[in-house]
Amino acid sequence: MAKFIKSGKVAIVVRGRYAGKKVVIVKPHDEGTKSHPFPHAIVAGIERAPLKVTKKMDAKKVTKRTKVKPFVKLVNYNHLMPTRYSLDVESFKSAVTSEALEEPSQREEAKKVVKKAFEEKHQAGKNKWFFQKLHF
């Protein structure tokens, strides 16, 4: 079977706390690891997507509405639904590792790096579908 869950692929979480949220796969583990002996992926996703902005809104409101709240997580392949979309993960790939997920302070640092990268992509107008709320 071809490996279609690759780094940079956008997926949707279908189970758990983040069900219905869009994620991008940072590092896939097809064979599993010693600590997690099942196929899984380290993902970075959007917990709260940015809201719509209009011209008549003042700068303070625009900055508040364009904030992205990210999360980083280890997710079983069974709980991911891959999409046809992809996203560049090189800007935060080194920060989001399995070691960073173990330690709470490193996890927070990884989230900050991901947040900065996601907000830059959103401001640039790239990957519009990824930054929209999934309506279902």
Curated annotation (Swiss-Prot):
Listed name of the protein: Large ribosomal subunit protein eL27
GO molecular function (one): structural constituent of ribosome
Family note: Belongs to the eukaryotic ribosomal protein eL27 family.
Keywords: Cytoplasm, Ribonucleoprotein, Ribosomal protein
GO terms for cellular component: cytosolic large ribosomal subunit; small-subunit processome
Gene Ontology biological-process entries: translation
Organism: Candida albicans (strain SC5314 / ATCC MYA-2876) (Yeast)
Keyword match rRNA processing: no
Gene encoding the protein: RPL27A
Subcellular location: Cytoplasm
Subunit structure: Component of the large ribosomal subunit. Mature ribosomes consist of a small (40S) and a large (60S) subunit. The 40S subunit contains about 32 different proteins and 1 molecule of RNA (18S). The 60S subunit contains 45 different proteins and 3 molecules of RNA (25S, 5.8S and 5S).
Summary of the function given for this chain in its UniProt record: Component of the ribosome, a large ribonucleoprotein complex responsible for the synthesis of proteins in the cell. The small ribosomal subunit (SSU) binds messenger RNAs (mRNAs) and translates the encoded message by selecting cognate aminoacyl-transfer RNA (tRNA) molecules. The large subunit (LSU) contains the ribosomal catalytic site termed the peptidyl transferase center (PTC), which catalyzes the formation of peptide bonds, thereby polymerizing the amino acids delivered by tRNAs into a polypeptide chain.
